[in-house]
Structures are given as structure tokens and as C-alpha cells.
């Protein structure tokens, strides 16, 4: 007898699922086994929360669907931070969760309500006869609408005989991306023609439109910038400002603030990207292009909003400019290019050292790592006071090389994010940049990294504190003993899991890291970097101004 659980798992593999993350319990045992029997790879994590984050990172880096398999009740609740991160970011994700529907079961919770509460879409396999249609609907929503879908699998339905044949309708062909009407394109072209200092700001929605935006920027003389999550999109372009917002270099911030036209492409223009509005000049015309009409003007005032796919809109605008015969140098000049070559990276910005005995400046650490690491790298960054250093000092080869965990601003997601990214791109060395607080929250997944044989470097910026809280409240005289901790030997903990482990306290210690990078890299390396603690990072100081 073929059960519904077996039929669902087999059908998912036939639909194209190749990789599944999760933790197996009795409720998701059979559907997971069916997936692997049909050819999918199952990546078992040590905790459901980590598995959820791995699936999110895998989807973001691979460009495919992330799939998570969890037990009913506590298996699902354990996974909620990662599910919330994905739902907030609108990562295409299918969560397979067993469901105890008996009200008196100790596993019973309102799982659909839980999904809705965090922005995910709840679906359910309602019966054996409807299972194929229910699965097709959940799949279609996840893939075509780029949503995180919780597909509940009631235990009794899973065990029921599946109808034969179990035919899941093929997903419909994707609809053509929306394009603004002619009047909107003409209005954007008018704004570009009138601008003398245009800046293009590309977000997550522009991830696959780099060629179109680069071409349009060359026609209009626009400088290029990205949100943090899209860092690397314009790497190598001499007019690339890198990241806007709190992470922006002084040169980038000045040039963005001086723009007379700011066009946001597939980005929300939120407080982080615009430094609470400080990067928008009083006379700057603001345009926003987004596929979601509700996103237009949601965070910042705009003068023109266009509902459309970024690549499609950029191509249409370029055609309109071609029709008009318009071409402008705009904001671009030899002087600007030379300035960006000198000042375009944070490591090129002069800094005062922060000496502290037995501790290394996180900026010096990050710059040294950038020099040591191979160019083919993926950088995954956890949340915390430290995060600007690896985010902006470690270069990345492209937008797929940077994975940021800030949609929900939960700490402790960095290591699992790196693992998911490493599974998606095993051809690149993956760097997990962590604070000590986040590292200790997710440290059990070091065993997963070892077991999978991942090419992974975990760098812990260890200030023995929740540094953001120390720097936020400490200067006002508040006690900070609840957010500071005694020293821990994180390198030794890493070795206990089977990793290599080194402690870095000064620049000379980087030789141990260099040896691992140039060696066979047959096991992950944990670097416990004891960083200086005297001042908040520059991005945190900017964030405090908005609180």
C-alpha cells in the first residue's frame, strides 16, 4: 500500500526537489524517507531552528526552492525564527510539517495560525483524495508567488492509502513579469533626462537585473549602489558605491546624499537603507520601482512609483531613452571614479586604532582575512555589533556571495546560514561571520558542518558580550552585567566538534589561519578572535541616532 506520506514525498521529488533540510521525528519520518528514496538529498541538522535557516540560505544562494521537513508541534515551534526570517524576506520555501489534529494531543497547536502570525502561508493536505491538488496549490504558491508556505501534514491523512494514480498537476507556466504602462515609463525617462546626479539603488528585487541596470546607468550617468542584502551586485564597476545606508562609506554617503535623483529598484527604501532618511537630500526626487504595489512609498516618501519587474522596467526605460536619442554623463566623471577607487571601500578609510591588550581590532582582523581568503567565497553574516566589519571589509565576487540574516533581526542564525549556503555552493569557501553571542546560540551545528565535510571558516568576533546592548545602554550609565560574560575558549569548543580551532589576539596570529586556508581544508576551522571592545561599530552608532 502506498500511503499519502509516501506519495507526497515522491511527488515532491518529481516536481524537482533535490535538497531537503530538517530534523526527523515520528511525524515527518515517512514523508522524508519517501523524498530521499525518490532521489532527493536530506541534510539533517541538530536543531530545527538551524534547519529552517539552512533551507532559507540554500534557496537564496541557489535561486531555487528551499524545503524544510519537521515534526509536529515542537518540531515546528523550534523552527519558527528561521521560518519568520524566510517569510519576512519572501524566500520561496516549502515547510513540510506533520500535524496533530486531535485537540487533546500534547502535540496539538494551531499550526495554521502560527504560520499566519509570522507572514507565512498555511496550507494543509486535507484528505487522501485531495492530496495531489493540495500539494500542487502549496507548490504553486511557494514557487510562483515566492512565499514561505507551511504545508501541514495531518498524521491520520499521512497514514491513509493514496489514490492511484497520484498525479500532481504540473505548475502553470509563470506569468510574464509586470511592466509599467507607457506613461509611467515616460515619466521615469523624463526624470532621468532632467537629472544631473542620478543614483540607482538596487535591492533584493534587482538580484537578477544587474545587466539591465548597468546598461541603463551607462546611458544616464547614474552611480550604482545596493542595499545590504544585494551587496556584490555591481562588483567591479568603477561607479559602484557599494552599500547604501548604515554600512555606507563616508564617500558613498556623501554622493548619495548629493544626488538630485534617487531611483530605488526592487528595494523598500526603509530606514536602514536610507539612514532614517538622512541619505535623501531635501530636493532629491525619489522614484521607486517594485513588483509589489503595496511596497511603493511604504517606508519613505516618493515622487514617482512604478509597479513592474526591475529588469523589464529598466529595459523599457532604456528603449524610451533610445527613442529620444538621450545619453548623459550624469553623475559620472573621471574625478568621481578616481575618488571611488581611493575611498570606495571601508578598509581604505583612515582609522584610529583601538589598542586593548590581548585583543585585535576587528577592522584589522577583517582586512587581514580579506587578503587571505580566496576570491571564490561566500560570506554569511550573523547579527550584532560586529556585523559591519565582515559585511563591508570582506569582498564578495557577486550578489550570490553575500548572505545576510537581518530580515527579522534575530541573532544566532549565522552559522546555519553559512551551512545552507555552503550546501548550495560547494565550489566556494564559505565564511560564517559570527558574534560570540550568536555563535554560542547555534554552536551545535558545528557538528553538522563537520559531518557534511563543508569547506567552511567560522570567524567569531568575540567581545564576551552582547555588544550592541553594551554600547547602546552603557554610555548612559545603565548597568551592563546582564549582557557581559566571562571568557570562553570557542576554538577549543570547535575542536571538540571535530573542527580545527585557533585563537587570534593580534595580527601575527593570522599565520595559523593562512595555513588552514592554503592547506587541504579537510575540516572546518573555528577562529576565536578576541576583538577590542572600546567603541561601538560605525554602523551601530548610526543606528543609535535613529532610536
Can you annotate each of these PLM segments?
Residues 5-8, 16, 23-26, 31-36, ...:
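Active-site diphosphate/adenylate-binding microenvironment
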Residues 2-84, 88:
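N-terminal cofactor/phosphate-binding cores enriched in small/glycine residues
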Residues 104-106, 247-249, 256-258, 297-299, ...:
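Thiamine diphosphate
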Residues 118, 137, 141-194:
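Conformationally flexible catalytic loops at phosphate/diphosphate-handling active centers
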Residues 67-159, 256, 267-288, 424-485:
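Conserved thiamine diphosphate
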Residues 7-17, 57-63, 87, 141-145, ...:
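Glycine-rich phosphate/diphosphate-binding loops that line cofactor/substrate pockets in enzymes
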Residues 96-134, 228-337, 473:
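Glycine-rich, acidic loop regions that bind phosphate or pyrophosphate groups
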Residues 129, 152-153, 164-165, 195, ...:
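Phosphate/pyrophosphate-binding active-site segments
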Amino acid at each position: 500500500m502506498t500511503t499519502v506520506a509516501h506519495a507526497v514525498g515522491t511527488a515532491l521529488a518529481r516536481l524537482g526537489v533535490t535538497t531537503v533540510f530538517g530534523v526527523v521525528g515520528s511525524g515527518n519520518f515517512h514523508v522524508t524517507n519517501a523524498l530521499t528514496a525518490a532521489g532527493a538529498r536530506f541534510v539533517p541538522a541538530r536543531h530545527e531552528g538551524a534547519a529552517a535557516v539552512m533551507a532559507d540560505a540554500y534557496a537564496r544562494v541557489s535561486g531555487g526552492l528551499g524545503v524544510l521537513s519537521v515534526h509536529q508541534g515542537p518540531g515546528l515551534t523550534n523552527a519558527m525564527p528561521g521560518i519568520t526570517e524566510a517569510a519576512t524576506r519572501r524566500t520561496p520555501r516549502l515547510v513540510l510539517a506533520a500535524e496533530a489534529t486531535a485537540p487533546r494531543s500534547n502535540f496539538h497547536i494551531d499550526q495554521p495560525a502560527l504560520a499566519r502570525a509570522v507572514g507565512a502561508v498555511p496550507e494543509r493536505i486535507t484528505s487522501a483524495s485531495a492530496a495531489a491538488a493540495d500539494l500542487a496549490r502549496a507548490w504553486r504558491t511557494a514557487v510562483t508567488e515566492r512565499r514561505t508556505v507551511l504545508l501541514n501534514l495531518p498524521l491520520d491523512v499521512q497514514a491513509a492509502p493514496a489514490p492511484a494514480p497520484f498525479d500532481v498537476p504540473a505548475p502553470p507556466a509563470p506569468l510574464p513579469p509586470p511592466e509599467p504602462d507607457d506613461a509611467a515609463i515616460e515619466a521615469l525617462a523624463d526624470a532621468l533626462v532632467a537629472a544631473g546626479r542620478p543614483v540607482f539603488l538596487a535591492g533584493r528585487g534587482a538580484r537578477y537585473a544587474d545587466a539591465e541596470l548597468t546598461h541603463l546607468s551607462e546611458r544616464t550617468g547614474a552611480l550604482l549602489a545596493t542595499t545590504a542584502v544585494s551587496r556584490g551586485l555591481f562588483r567591479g564597476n568603477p561607479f559602484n558605491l557599494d552599500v547604501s545606508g548604515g554600512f555606507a562609506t563616508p564617500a558613498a554617503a556623501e554622493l548619495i546624499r548629493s544626488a538630485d535623483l534617487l531611483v530605488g529598484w526592487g528595494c523598500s527604501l526603509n530606514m536602514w537603507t536610507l539612514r532614517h532618511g538622512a541619505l535623501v537630500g531635501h530636493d532629491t526626487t525619489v522614484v521607486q520601482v517594485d513588483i509589489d504595489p503595496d511596497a511603493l512609498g511604504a517606508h519613505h516618501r516618493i515622487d514617482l512609483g512604478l509597479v513592474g519587474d526591475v529588469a523589464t522596467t529598466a529595459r523599457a526605460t532604456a528603449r524610451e531613452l533610445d527613442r529620444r536619442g538621450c545619453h548623459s554623463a550624469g553623475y559620472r566623471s573621471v574625478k568621481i571614479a578616481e575618488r571611488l577607487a581611493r575611498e570606495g571601500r571601508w578598509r581604505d578609510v583612515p582609522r584610529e586604532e583601538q589598542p586593548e591588550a590581548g585583543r585585535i581590532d576587528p577592522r584589522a582582523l577583517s582586512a587581514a582575512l580579506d587578503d587571505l581568503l580566496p576570491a571564490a567565497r561566500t560570506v554569511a553574516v550573523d547579527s550584532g555589533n560586529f556585523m559591519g566589519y565582515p559585511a563591508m571589509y570582506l569582498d564578495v565576487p557577486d550578489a550570490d556571495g553575500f548572505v545576510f540574516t537581518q530580515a527579522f533581526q534575530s541573532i544566532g542564525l549565522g552559522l546555519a546560514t553559512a551551512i545552507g549556503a555552503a550546501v548550495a555552493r560547494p565550489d566556494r569557501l564559505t565564511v560564517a561571520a559570527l558574534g560570540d553571542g550568536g555563535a554560542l546560540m547555534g554552536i551545535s551545528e558545528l557538528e553538522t558542518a563537520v559531518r557534511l565535510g563543508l569547506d567552511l571558516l567560522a570567524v567569531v568576533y568575540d567581545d564576551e558580550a552582547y555588544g550592541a546592548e553594551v554600547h547602546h545602554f552603557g554610555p548612559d550609565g545603565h548597568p551592563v552585567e546582564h549582557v557581559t560574560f566571562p571568557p570562553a575558549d570557542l576554538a577549543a569548543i570547535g575542536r571538540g566538534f571535530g573542527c580545527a580551532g585557533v585563537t587570534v589576539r593580534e595580527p601575527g596570529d593570522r599565520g595559523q589561519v593562512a595555513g588552514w586556508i592554503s592547506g587541504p581544508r579537510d575540516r572546518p576551522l573555528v577562529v576565536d578572535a578576541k576583538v577590542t571592545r572600546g567603541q561601538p561599530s560605525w554602523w551601530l552608532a548610526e543606528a543609535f541616532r535613529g532610536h
